[in-house]
């Protein structure tokens, strides 16, 4: 089973980033079983650059719940699955840190789509 994941984060210092949006698609190898997405209040200001990049403003997040509210749901979605995503090591690190702040230990195998695309370009014939 696979959990395709994409996080948007607040930006800022390394290991201080907070999740502002979570999107997860659960795939069993044949079909999508479940999808989930939500905005998250990071309780810190989102960098201006991130606001421009994502279109998510601080005002959009003020009334949202914090990650702690979503932690168990997110864990239930991703546990015992391989995490897949674009630059997934970043998302994995941030997710792991957020779960740790909720006193939840989490480990997973990962597949990075950047590496997969690079490999595909090397192995597929060109026209």
Regions found by a protein language model. Name each.
Residues 1-108:
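Conserved non-catalytic scaffold segment of RNase H-like nuclease domains
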Residues 120-126:
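Conserved small/polar residues in nucleotide/adenosyl-binding loops
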Residues 107-117:
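A short, structured active-site edge motif that brings together acidic residues
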């Amino acid at each position: 089973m696979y959990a395709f994941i994409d996080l948007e984060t607040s930006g800022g210092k390394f290991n201080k980033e907070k999740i502002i949006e979570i999107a997860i698609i659960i795939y069993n190898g044949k079909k999508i079983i479940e999808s989930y997405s939500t905005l998250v209040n990071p309780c810190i200001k989102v960098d201006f650059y991130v606001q421009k990049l994502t279109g998510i403003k601080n005002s959009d997040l003020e009334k949202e719940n914090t990650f702690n509210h979503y932690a168990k749901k997110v864990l239930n979605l991703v546990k015992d699955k391989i995490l897949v995503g674009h630059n997934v090591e970043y998302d994995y690190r941030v997710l792991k840190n957020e779960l740790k702040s909720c006193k939840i230990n989490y480990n997973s195998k990962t597949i990075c789509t950047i590496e997969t695309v690079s490999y595909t370009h090397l192995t597929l014939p060109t026209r």
